[in-house]
Amino acid sequence: MNHVWTKQVMLSFRAIGTFGGSMRRTLAVLYTFLLCALLNTVALAQSAADPGAAEKQFARQMAREHGLDAAAVLEILHRATYRQSVIDTMQRPAEAKPWKDYRPIFVTQRRIDDGAAFLEDNRALLERVGGQYGVPPELIAAIIGVESNYGHTPMRYRVLDALVTLAFYYPPRATYFRSELAQLLLLHSAAFPYAPEELTGSYAGAMGWPQFMPSSVAKYAREGDADGKIDLWNSLPDICASVGNYFEAFGWQTGAPVALRAQVAANARTLEPKGLDPVYPLQQLAEWGYTADAKLDPATPATLLRLDGVDGPEFWITFRNFQVISRYNKSPLYSMAVYQLSEAIAAAARAP
């Protein structure tokens, strides 16, 4: 710890002794809290400034928990290159924007047209995958469109570089990214025969067209072309099967609604639910002043979502399938962008 800070804190504790009992106890608690906060800040700064120790600890943990050779793990980590742009991008996520600014990023006429073309060019594959997993072809197309612009988004980062940078130089989410780094090192197999430094993806370490994190690759990636390996960069059957399996695994309900624009009564009850869990029957929402132009069972579970649109607040009634989309990205803005893009793709594909 900086010696000036240490001296100032000690002098402050001595000064506490000049106050009365009650005030002295209050100030003691306050200074103890501030000291703990300072120590924690210094510890985090030291961890980011000296990742070597953290890397060694990580290597020992991989050896202890997974049987990997610690020296081999360190050798792989040392192949990584620190990328400041990863940290910079992590600190300004698109999901921080309001809906009126977020939607135009993903739901564009170009992306709709490309999605409709992707749907038509791969209809047999998408219908086969959709039938296998119960997921609409246009939803698979929309996910691929949002995540990688149908493969046109450059995979600028080596996944190893991104994950090592975030695991050891980004304290706010170091625990999560170290777990993903661990998964990356455990992925290598006959079905996924790639060295960690060969894999390319996003600034967050998400891989291929569907932008799967290593843990998602391990759990949900599937082979779709019977060639004996999973390729999320070049094999459309593998890419589409993996997306379809992901949604099935999280409980996609075939044929069920996703979201409906709400009609709001003048005397509607103010309602701002936390999260996307559909906890209200449609009948309850209707009694509170929120209805949708659709014939659905009044007992259907749903919830209400408020978005900041171009013309003011937008209210949407969302269902279980909307929540399932959020398993891909927890932001409700993301789920709505995917849903609206999928609807637009389907409409464009049907157009003469």
What spans do the regions from the language model cover?
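Bacterial N-terminal signal peptides that target proteins for export
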Residues: V4-Y31
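Bacterial N-terminal signal peptides
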Residues: A28-N40
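Sec/Tat signal peptide C-region and signal peptidase I cleavage site
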Residues: T41-A45
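An acidic, Gly/Ser/Thr/Pro-rich helix-cap/linker signature
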Residues: Q46-D121, E127-G130
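Acidic helix-start/capping segments at beta-turn-to-alpha-helix junctions
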Residues: V73-E95, I144-S148, R158-D161, R261-R269
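Acidic/His-rich structured neighborhood in mature extracellular/periplasmic domains
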Residues: P104-S242, E248
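Flexible, glycine-rich surface segments
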Residues: A195-V310
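C-terminal functional modules
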Residues: P301-P352
